[in-house]
Amino acid sequence: MGKAKATMKAVGSGLADIGTVIGVYHPAEFPVWNFSNTPFLISDAWVGMRTWYELRNTTPELNKETDRQKIMILFNNTTGPVQLLMAKKAVTTAAGLKGMKIRATGGWTTLFKNLGAAPVKIGFGELYAALDRGTIDGTVNYTPYVKSYKHYEVASHLVEANMGQLLGYGGAINSKLFKGMDKKLQDILVKTSDEYMDVYAKNYISDAVAAKKAMIAGIDGKKVTFHTLSASEEAKWKAAAASFRTQWIAKMKKKGVDAEGFIAKFETIHNKYKKIVAEKGYPWSN
């Protein structure tokens, strides 16, 4: 057993065979992969997982990062849409965020800082206590997690801002271990990992709907009120997040990475999966 931030090194060193690696914990090691954590990049869980899985299978820059850490990503994961959970007061405007202590990570730190909030770094496991004590006013969160971690007991407002997803997140295996496996076993792992993403996305989407319904109705007397952003406010929030992409492009150019080419490829694949959902629905709905 190890802490989440230690998983990458544990798997790479062989201390662990397989583990969940979260790119946002390792920005220096996974600068290309962390583009996936850009606010407002992708809102659909299945589309996001599939987009980044295909990108990884077709983009050398992504695999060079994991090769250096002696790991291989078997499947891409997701937190689902990033929302804003507020303890006592709903905030649906940029003006209302000024001075608010908001727990954020990755590109969302940039977003909330630009909106005038005070970003705070706190581990996800510490959120319940931080919300309860008033250490923070709110946090980025994910609808099913608000229910499963019982954050609804200490926070009563959830703003469905749909600020993208944390997609730099996946299941990793030690590279040497995988390469030493029989081809048949390798194929089973790859096939199972591919199937997992569809199952995970299906369950995530249904769990999000069920969690929202339960929290609106109330759980043990605790209710959560759901809010949305107006179109004009959403535009302001997106504008506040734009500098994250600009900064990422500049960093990639310094590293010799064709950032614009990478983004163009990302957008082509992203549009491919959006089109599939629009025209055919999800794989499990057919």
Segment roles from a protein language model:
Residues Y53:
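An acidic, glycine-rich surface segment that forms the CoA-thioester-binding/catalytic face
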Residues M1-M49, N57, E61-N286:
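N-terminal secretory/targeting leader peptides
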